[in-house]
């Protein structure tokens, strides 16, 4: 059952709401415009608030649904987390869009909402506060994601290994943003 859910999660994660919505509305392809990222922040820049919110909700749901399904069929928290990571991998490397996806932050947040909601609240709160103070989405994601690890180590220790892997994936996916942050070139809102 685990492998079937992992594959299903990857395929669901591969549905890029940013790309689909941009095609449906005639908006620029987020992979070749703005920051080049197929995610909600770039959709906000390119297509406005409405499409950004729809992208965010779609990306949250595709992270959340596989984990909830994994829980429903009786997988343990670690297996649920690995299934959720498969959804994030789908977002990062979508099979339907030549493996050119987003950075996985919203999909990871949806996964975390289903896995352990207090950790998701911590991450979302840290993201909002950091974004409010810096107006920089990438920095907010890079600060918020690792903050969940101590709470998970304490309350959901069996999910700590996959969540550490997830954190490393998100940091790796933001490597160009890190270079821009250190060089003072990162985009702000």
UniProtKB/Swiss-Prot annotation:
One of its GO terms (biological process) is phospholipid biosynthetic process. Its main location: membrane. Pathway: Lipid metabolism; phospholipid metabolism. InterPro entries: G3P_acylTferase_PlsY (IPR003811). It is an enzyme of class 2 (transferase). It catalyses: an acyl phosphate + sn-glycerol 3-phosphate = a 1-acyl-sn-glycero-3-phosphate + phosphate. NCBIfam families: glycerol-3-phosphate 1-O-acyltransferase PlsY. Catalyzes the transfer of an acyl group from acyl-phosphate (acyl-PO(4)) to glycerol-3-phosphate (G3P) to form lysophosphatidic acid (LPA). This enzyme utilizes acyl-phosphate as fatty acyl donor, but not acyl-CoA or acyl-ACP. Probably interacts with PlsX. This is Glycerol-3-phosphate acyltransferase. It comes from Pseudomonas entomophila (strain L48). The lineage of its organism: Bacteria, Pseudomonadati, Pseudomonadota, Gammaproteobacteria, Pseudomonadales. The gene is plsY.
């Amino acid at each position: 059952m685990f492998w079937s859910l992992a594959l299903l999660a990857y395929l669901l994660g591969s549905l890029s709401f940013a790309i689909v919505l941009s095609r449906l509305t005639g908006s620029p392809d987020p992979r070749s415009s703005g920051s080049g990222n197929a995610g909600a922040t770039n959709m906000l820049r390119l297509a406005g608030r409405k499409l950004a919110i729809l992208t965010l909700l779609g990306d949250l749901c595709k992270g959340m649904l596989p984990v909830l399904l994994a829980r429903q069929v009786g997988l343990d928290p670690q297996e649920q987390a690995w299934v959720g990571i498969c959804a994030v991998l789908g977002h990062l490397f979508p099979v339907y869009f030549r493996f050119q996806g987003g950075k996985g932050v919203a999909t990871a947040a949806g996964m975390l909402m289903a896995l352990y909601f207090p950790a998701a609240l911590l991450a979302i709160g840290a993201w909002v506060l950091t974004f409010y103070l810096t107006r920089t989405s990438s920095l907010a994601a890079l600060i918020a994601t690792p903050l969940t690890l101590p709470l998970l180590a304490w309350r959901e220790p069996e999910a700590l290994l996959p969540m550490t892997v997830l954190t490393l994936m998100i940091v790796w996916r933001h490597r160009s943003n890190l270079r821009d942050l250190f060089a003072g070139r990162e985009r702000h809102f």
